[in-house]
Design a protein with these regions (language model features):
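Conserved, non-catalytic sequence blocks in retroelement Pol enzymes and Pol-derived host proteins
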Residues: 10-15, 35
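Non-catalytic, well-ordered alpha-helical scaffold segments
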Residues: 19-23, 41-42
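N-terminal recruitment modules of adaptor/scaffold proteins
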Residues: 27-28, 33-152
Length: 152
């Protein structure tokens, strides 16, 4: 099931955040559609880890692909990612998985691409645009995003 929204504020409707919004936004982050810093990625990775494993101390390195955006995976070694995610995870000790979902949404809510529907586009007609684009459609309109740099 998919929920469409145009004026959602994380935390305002906890049930919708926990049931719909988190699960709709997570794959968009992991596919690398949003412009995200490595610091934000580590924080979000820790929140995703908490959603999946709560307080269980499983091995972070074995599940990195499900914690960080695909386009950022190679900017640090697995060991460095594990260290940064563990650091962020330890800062939020005692947070429940549902609270982690809302905290995740509050981070990405600040981004101009929050709540977008994304489309990967291969274009050949306009040489002033890159060959590979991501088209993001949200309440602010239609955005053309460079697939590698994530610049709007």
């Amino acid at each position: 099931m998919r929920k469409l929204w145009s004026s959602t504020v994380p935390g305002k409707d906890r049930s919708a955040d926990i049931i719909f919004h988190f699960h709709q936004e997570l794959p968009k982050l992991l596919r690398g559609y949003h412009q995200c810093t490595k610091e934000e990625a580590a924080i979000l990775g820790a929140l995703i880890y908490r959603v999946k494993y709560a307080e269980t101390k499983a091995d972070i390195s074995s599940c990195l692909k499900s914690l960080i955006p695909s386009d950022l995976a190679k900017i640090m070694s697995s060991h460095e990612w594990k260290k940064e995610i563990a650091r962020a995870y330890n800062k939020d000790s005692g947070m429940s998985p549902d609270e982690a979902k809302i905290a995740f949404l509050k981070v990405i809510y600040r981004w101009p691409t929050y709540g977008s529907a994304f489309f990967e586009v291969h274009q050949v007609s306009d040489p002033s645009f890159p060959e590979h684009l991501i088209v993001a459609i949200n309440k602010q309109g239609v955005n053309m995003i460079h697939a590698q740099s994530k610049v709007l």
